[in-house]
Amino acid sequence: MLSYSTHITHPNLPWVTFVHGAGGSSTIWYKQLRAFRKSFNVLLVDLRGHGKSKAPFYEKLKNYNFSTIGDEVLEVLDHLKIQRTHWVGISLGTIIIREITERNPHRTLSMIMGGAVMKLNKRGQVLMRTGAALKSVLPYMVLYRFFAWIIMPRKTHHEARNLFILEARKLYQREFKRWFTLVAEVNPLLKYFRFNDSNVPTLYIMGSQDHMFLPSIRKIVAFHQSALLHVIENCGHVVNIEQPEVFNNAAIKFLKQHSNNA
């Protein structure tokens, strides 16, 4: 089972499950925990190969797709007897949340999609294919640093960029390559998500400087009736770290509005 931690305020409060992105860990939510615990029970999960989810079992697994990763998260919920939860995700974690909800809509109360990845633009696709071709030649941290700079290029993004680089150093190289290959092949799944409304209350929280992903999210929100968009000014990709107070306020307000059926 994946490594996880729970923060239970009251048994009758709804749950919020946080899902980090590739190369991160549950520690990236340190600016959210105090605020969310006031109104919710909180579950933090380390995805396979990340944080403390590094048992040899995960190293040996050949099968690597978003459904398998989602099932591992659901295994934690089942273990804790959590029937329904709100989800909060960042970056590639939003793909996992959306995939879980697609197959198990009855488990989801609502979704907060921070720095959501729902389409790789042409530049992103070229970069991912180039990286996939070079991943067996270059040290994985060289690739990770490169992509961190591409996605978070400004000086104001340095805290988030440095945190993700620091967390990525803790990954096994084989694990990084598996995730990289997974992301390089994700476009068909993302296309399905863009053209199919989840019919679950969804709030996208994006930075105005998230040049690679914000344009596609604007189009999705215009098309999906269940989705809303909150753009944080002067903010990059990792919104929960760069502008935590704005992120927390917007997310908590939205979650409270959709907690009646918890």
Predicted regions and their residues:
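Conserved HGGG/HGGXW glycine-rich cap/lid loop of the alpha/beta-hydrolase fold
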Residues: 5-58
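Conserved loop-alpha-helix segment in the C-terminal half of the alpha/beta-hydrolase fold
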Residues: 201-235, 241
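Gly/Ala-rich beta-loop-alpha elbow adjacent to hydrolase catalytic centers
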Residues: 89-93, 97
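Alpha/beta-hydrolase fold catalytic core
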Residues: 1-17, 38-41, 78, 83, ...
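Catalytic active-site module of serine/aspartate enzymes centered on a nucleophile-bearing elbow/loop
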Residues: 225-262
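Flexible "cap/lid" loop of the alpha/beta hydrolase fold
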Residues: 102, 108-138
